[in-house]
């Protein structure tokens, strides 16, 4: 069963990177429609996620990017995947006419999760040292899933800490 935070091959982020074949600037507005904060990442040419900002519910982030620059979003507190325009990876497209400036609106929404996944992830809000005692009564398979979620949350935290914010004044709307 997928835990919702990883790609099918077990990674928190897809194995994609940016290229620079098209240098036309594209304006994008990411709008968070989730009930929780989300982190917005650009996947750089080295295939590493670069965090551009954290968006609270109903807040937005305006950025300038290019075609062939993939973007993803993750739930801030645990790295669970969310959707950008109903897809796991957003690929910006330039305006149909060269002299037309258009802002692409990208709506970030929750990904559908099973009840089992939601229940397992509910333990992530507890202090990690308390979780083993709280899950003792669960079947062994569910205990392993909760421990897996905790490991992924830790891995996500480490990635976010390593991620270097982009230069310049582009920041989330307050």
Swiss-Prot record:
Disruption of the gene: reported phenotype: Increased mortality induced by B.thuringiensis pore-forming toxins Cry21A and Cry21B. Increased mortality and sensitivity to paralysis induced by enteropathogenic E.coli infection. Increased mortality upon heat stress. RNAi-mediated knockdown causes an enhanced resistance to polyglutamine or amyloid-beta-mediated paralysis and an increase in adult life span.
Superkingdom field: Eukaryota
Segment forming the signal sequence: none
Pathway recorded for this protein: Protein modification; protein ubiquitination
Database matches in InterPro entries: VHL_beta_dom, VHL_beta_dom_sf, VHL_sf, VHL_tumour_suppress_b/a_dom
Keywords recorded for this protein, A-Z: Ubl conjugation pathway
One Pfam short name: VHL
Listed GO CC annotations: Cul2-RING ubiquitin ligase complex; nucleus; VCB complex
CDD domains: pVHL
GO biological process, one term: protein ubiquitination
Family per similarity comment: Belongs to the VHL family.
Function: Involved in the response to variation in environmental oxygen levels by targeting the hypoxia-inducible transcription factor hif-1 for proteasomal degradation when oxygen levels are normal (around 20%). By regulating hif-1 expression, plays a role in iron homeostasis, aging, heat acclimation and progeny size. Mediates resistance to enteropathogenic E.coli. Mediates susceptibility to B.thuringiensis pore-forming toxins. Not involved in P.aeruginosa susceptibility.
Quaternary structure, from the entry: Interacts with hif-1 (hydroxylated on 'Pro-621'); the interaction induces hif-1 degradation. May be a component of the cullin E3 ubiquitin ligase complex.
Official protein name in the record: von Hippel-Lindau tumor suppressor homolog
Source organism (scientific name): Caenorhabditis elegans
Organism ancestry: Eukaryota, Metazoa, Ecdysozoa, Nematoda, Chromadorea
Gene expressing this chain: vhl-1
């Amino acid at each position: 069963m997928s835990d919702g935070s990883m790609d099918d091959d077990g990674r928190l982020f897809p194995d994609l990177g940016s290229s620079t074949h098209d240098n036309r600037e594209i304006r994008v507005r990411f709008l968070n429609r989730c009930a929780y904060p989300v982190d917005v990442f650009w996947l750089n040419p080295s295939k590493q996620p670069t965090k551009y900002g954290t968006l609270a519910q109903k807040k937005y982030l305006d950025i300038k990017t290019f075609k062939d620059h993939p973007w993803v979003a993750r739930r801030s507190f645990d790295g669970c995947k969310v959707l950008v325009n109903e897809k796991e990876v957003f690929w910006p497209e330039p305006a149909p006419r060269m002299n037309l400036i258009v802002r692409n609106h990208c709506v970030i929404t929750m990904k559908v999760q099973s009840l089992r996944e939601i229940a397992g992830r509910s333990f992530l809000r507890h202090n990690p040292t308390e979780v083993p005692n709280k899950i003792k009564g669960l079947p062994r398979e569910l205990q392993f899933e909760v421990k897996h979620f905790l490991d992924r949350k830790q891995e996500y935290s480490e990635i976010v800490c390593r991620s270097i914010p982009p230069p310049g004044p582009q920041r989330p709307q307050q």
